[in-house]
Amino acid sequence: MPLQVKYLGLQPYESTWEAMQRFTNERTEHTPDELWVVEHPPVFTQGLNGQAKHLQAFALEQNIPIIQTDRGGQVTYHGPGQIIIYVLLDLKRAQLGVRDLVHRMEKAIIEFLCDLSISADARPDAPGVYVDGQKIASLGLKIRKQKSYHGLALNFDMDLTPFSWITPCGLEGIQMTQVSHFIQQPDQLASQTALIKALCHQLQPEIDS
């Protein structure tokens, strides 16, 4: 059953999160898996392991919402110019464990970046994708009854300043980077398509082949 891809454009975080929960609660064994491609207005989100100390006082003074979510991980920032893909899978049907899903998501991002001549890797101690030790993509998932939602966020061509007001993903001293630091005037729409293709190849290789 091929993955269904939905391009949602710029959407508020909370309503998108509610839609993911609703989709996951209502889906049946026959519901196709979906990938949602989206951007959000500026927002800080706290994962289930998030700590208040990772939000600096300056961040609290900004006119940016801070939302406690049900995904794994700690605090991060979303904003325009970031490619976000929410991964809504039936893990039992796909015969995927959570660690395998994370690994495949990371591998898809790494392969996509490699095609742009950006050398990236993953870390066993901190999920995500890194370029020369700087974080370029973050991952966070929620698994409910063997169904996944939330997903990945790739920094593409955005204002990274709000990341300096937090401790991203709880990683002290981590620096953030983005695709536009390595490529002049990158094409976001074309890159969304290429990243989706890489993700589909990793999640459904038998269909993609």
From Swiss-Prot:
Gene3D superfamilies in the record: Bira Bifunctional Protein, Domain 2
Keywords: Acyltransferase, Cytoplasm, Transferase
Catalytic activity: octanoyl-[ACP] + L-lysyl-[protein] = N(6)-octanoyl-L-lysyl-[protein] + holo-[ACP] + H(+)
Domain BPL/LPL catalytic: 29-209
An annotated GO BP: protein modification process
Binding-site residues for substrate, renumbered to this chain: 71-78, 138-140, 151-153
Enzyme class label: transferase
Pathway participation: Protein modification; protein lipoylation via endogenous pathway; protein N(6)-(lipoyl)lysine from octanoyl-[acyl-carrier-protein]: step 1/2
GO cellular component, one term: cytoplasm
InterPro entries: aa-tRNA-synth_II/BPL/LPL (IPR045864), BPL_LPL_catalytic (IPR004143), Octanoyltransferase (IPR000544), Octanoyltransferase_CS (IPR020605)
EC number: 2.3.1.181
Record site feature (Lowers pKa of active site Cys), residues: 135
Pfam families linked: LplA-B_cat
GO molecular function, one term: lipoyl(octanoyl) transferase activity
Subcellular location: Cytoplasm
Enzyme active site: 169
Further remark: In the reaction, the free carboxyl group of octanoic acid is attached via an amide linkage to the epsilon-amino group of a specific lysine residue of lipoyl domains of lipoate-dependent enzymes.
PANTHER family: LIPOYLTRANSFERASE 2, MITOCHONDRIAL-RELATED (PTHR10993:SF7), OCTANOYLTRANSFERASE (PTHR10993)
HAMAP family, A to Z: LipB
Family that this chain belongs to: Belongs to the LipB family.
Its biological purpose: Catalyzes the transfer of endogenously produced octanoic acid from octanoyl-acyl-carrier-protein onto the lipoyl domains of lipoate-dependent enzymes. Lipoyl-ACP can also act as a substrate although octanoyl-ACP is likely to be the physiological substrate.
Protein name per its UniProtKB record: Octanoyltransferase
